[in-house]
Design a protein with these regions (language model features):
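Hydrophobic small-molecule pocket/channel-lining residues, especially in calycin-type beta-barrels
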Residues: 21-262
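Sec-dependent N-terminal signal peptides
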Residues: 4-15
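Sec/Tat signal peptide C-region and signal peptidase I cleavage site
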Residues: 16-20
Length: 262
């Protein structure tokens, strides 16, 4: 699902028929400040001129020389570059088929305890970018002699994401659940039915939806048949707030995402 913390990230959100209009039908917008992000850290380092990310899937290991280098197995990009800007800043960029797919500028604070990242996600098939900033707290230092941005970092909810990465819509019509986003990601799935195709996201290819109660939908997302994440989405009694419990199977993370009806 196009979860709205990239990805935090990137990122990107993910029975019985409903007789009256479903409480899910409508446009929703994620609330970054109200959400609870995973406490599992991300780990990367620049050592001896190489950038490594051990928590990336697949693991990344490229020269940090500003040039693009091949990446195999990532559905969103096939090349990546890492540039050391100064002792506290690096820039990362990615592209797929020669076309830019994303970039980020990462800066560590003067005291070395926090990390700020300004990003642009250009993976949307319709060309609509998602931009934003994230802030992380240091969990552990990087290897001796590594760049100051190196280490283990835990995400916080102190960040901003453009509306293109926060807004999504549901339309429940009988047993059919339709999902769409400004970045062109969409599906139409039958409640309790087989996996339905997802369009507009190369890393999310199909989904299933069940409805254990009128106010709850459970969406399970897949990439080429492998489970990515499970979203258990519940709408509040007043119909204004959606709480999504996210079990990110691929990255082993759990989070709670909050969205409000627009």
């Amino acid at each position: 699902m196009n979860a709205f913390l990239p990805c935090l990230i990137a990122a990107t959100l993910s029975a019985s028929p409903v007789a009256a209009q479903s409480v899910f039908t409508g446009t929703w917008k994620g609330d970054v400040a109200a959400s609870q992000v995973s406490t599992k850290p991300s780990i990367f380092a620049i050592t001896n001129g190489r950038y490594t990310c051990s928590t990336c899937k697949p693991v990344v290991d490229v020269l940090a020389d500003g040039a693009f280098h091949p990446i195999v197995g990532n559905p969103y990009y096939d090349e990546m570059s890492v540039t050391i800007v100064d002792p506290v800043t690096i820039k990362r960029a990615s592209r797929k088929g020669g076309k830019p797919s994303g970039d980020s500028t990462v800066t560590v604070s003067a005291d070395g305890t926090s990390l700020s990242t300004a990003f642009t996600d250009m993976t949307a098939a319709n060309g609509v970018p998602v931009t934003g900033t994230t802030k992380s707290e240091r969990v552990a230092a990087g290897p001796a002699g590594s760049h100051a941005t190196s280490g283990s970092w835990r995400a916080t909810n102190s960040g901003e994401v453009s509306d293109s990465g926060l807004t999504f819509a549901f339309a429940v019509e009988g047993k059919t659940v339709k999902y769409s986003s400004p970045t062109g990601v969409a599906y139409a799935a039958t409640i309790g039915g087989p996996a339905a195709p997802v369009t507009g996201d190369p890393g999310w290819t199909s989904t299933t939806v069940t409805q254990p109660s009128p106010d709850t939908l459970v969406e399970t997302d897949f990439h080429d048949g492998k489970t990515l994440a499970i979203y258990t989405m519940t709408v509040s009694p007043d119909g204004r707030t959606m709480t999504s419990k996210v079990d990110d199977i691929k990255y082993g993370k759990k989070s709670t995402l909050i969205a409000t009806k627009q």
